Regions:
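Class I SAM-dependent methyltransferase SAM-binding "motif I" and its flanking Rossmann-like core
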Residues: 94-152
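Conserved helicase motor
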Residues: 54-62, 134-139
Length: 220
């Protein structure tokens, strides 16, 4: 009898936000499929658990095949990303797609999501929204994606890394104008958490003089 693939959310920053069901699922799993085994090892140490792990981040198609074969032989797998809900802007989505196609039972074990957490505290319209995840790395492709969003009336949510924030703010300003409202949510649930609602023009000016630090969720 085949096992089960559990899609397990982990805290987005503060380990005290760990739901009991998440810890129990890790404890009951035969093995863990992790985005980065080093990050997940810290989580397991916090929980006092030892489990065999495999990383799925690189070559998700090939790694996924091995993971799914183990589940088909009866093992239960807990799949997690470094933080938040896996398989959203994450290569784990390929594994879930293939698991469903092969008739493997997939069970969500939800917890915090940086996207929804940022939206809730953004002060922007939360009635209708769209999640864009990370914008393309290629500058031309990024500008094309932003051009597609020019007519978007829903609140738009992006993820961004600190080393790319300045360029992204410049591109957003060029596309939407410096008066466009934006909320920058930095290091959510962590020690240096910051939620700043401002305009694109003010954000560009601020980060021209200040180094971006930490992971960002942009809500505009």
């Amino acid at each position: 009898m085949a096992g089960t693939l559990y899609i397990v959310a982990t805290p987005i920053g503060n380990l005290e936000d760990m739901p009991p069901r998440v810890a129990a699922t890790f404890g009951a799993a035969d093995f863990i499929a992790a985005e980065d085994t080093r990050v997940t090892m810290k989580l397991l140490n916090f929980l006092g658990l030892k489990k065999p792990m495999v990383s799925y981040y690189e070559h998700a198609l090939q790694k996924g095949e091995g993971i799914l074969r183990r589940i088909e032989t009866g093992e239960n797998c807990a799949l997690c990303s470094d933080a938040g809900m896996p398989c959203v802007s994450d290569p784990g989505e390929v594994i879930v797609r293939d698991a469903l196609a092969r008739g493997i039972k997939v069970v969500p074990v939800p917890a915090a999501s940086a996207c929804v957490t940022a939206l809730a505290v953004s002060g922007q319209d939360t009635s209708r929204w769209v999640f864009e995840g990370f914008l393309p790395v290629n500058r031309k492709q990024k500008k094309e994606r932003l051009a597609e969003l020019l007519g978007e009336k829903r609140t738009v949510i992006f993820y961004e890394a600190p080393h790319k924030l300045r360029t992204t703010l410049d591109d957003l300003t060029a596309a939407f104008g410096e008066d466009r409202s934006i909320t920058l949510c930095r290091e959510l649930t962590k020690l240096h958490e910051e939620i700043w609602k401002t305009t694109l023009g003010e954000a560009v000016a601020h980060y021209a003089a200040n180094e971006p630090r930490g992971e960002y969720v942009l809500v505009m």
